[in-house]
């Protein structure tokens, strides 16, 4: 069976040599004349009859074709079948990619969040607001993701997105709605835009997962009364909107690009919402914490994806996750200067009577990304006899996470 790169080559063979196929989701929006065998005159005739794209051509029934002047029925039938073959191939490939939709007002911080998860810290200060739509095929934590970053300027919202919503809001697995926590003058505008997005999704019969991302929650700002009031204001305004649309599952999360771990945790929450195995992973972690008398446990990839965690305490969850992410960052630094990565990483806090310890279980994806099982424990030795048992249970679930 051909792999994805082979299929991309196969798709390219249907198109004229001058056509560049950069993004899968753009293929079905190309004009008919981009296909080999369809000249400009025939393409114009198709467009005149409402068949403007390869997607439109694929939607025709080969057994009930329209009559189009100067185009033989047999020729049209062939083109339709080719378009349908391309359509099927594109849709199959897209199903293997989770679609993440980044929405929010301009200057909200959407593109900066994507830059952090791609380790592009140096470009954040020079980023300009996204104009229109920026689509990227990304390797998120070793999994294929299609990211749609929708610029938030009003002219794009009114004249582009809501004019042709089916082009932008369909087949999204999760929507990240980003709002600037430091811009209270636009909270009402942001909530109204959010409402319009939900209305469009209902009209399109789409039901993606949602995460409202309260961005620019910088560490120094978080300590102020103003920030706390802003967050309360945001949640109040958005909660009123959410009550109007009870069919959606919507959560809140705050981040800052100046603390990498907050961005990783935000994306982890988002991906867990659309994962096929995250719930099972967390059930296994619950069993693990019980057997080793741990206060909390998390399964974390070396590049920052938290596959799942279990604890009875929100404080313990923050403690184990933040410690894991920071110690793994230190491990990555050691590895970058030529040191061998340790299989066991720990931080002892004797005055507090516990240890945070991470044990490497396995690697996943073609990128061979290490995965560590982290636990907040009083007696770390209890972990040693249980690791192989839980490793065998967790490995297949990680491979099927997305």
Spans of features found by a protein language model:
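Switch II of P-loop NTPase G domains
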Residues: 145-176, 180-200
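Glycine-rich phosphate-binding P-loop
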Residues: 99-119
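Compact, charge-rich alpha-helical regulatory domains located at protein termini
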Residues: 1-91
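Short hydrophobic alpha-helical segments used for membrane anchoring or interfacial signaling
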Residues: 297-309
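Switch I (effector-binding) loop of TRAFAC-class P-loop GTPase G-domains
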Residues: 94, 117-144
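A charged amphipathic helix-loop-strand protein-protein interaction module that recurs
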Residues: 312-361
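Conserved beta-strand/loop subsegment of P-loop NTPase cores
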Residues: 172-178, 201-218, 239-254
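Canonical P-loop GTPase G-domain recognition
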Residues: 220-283
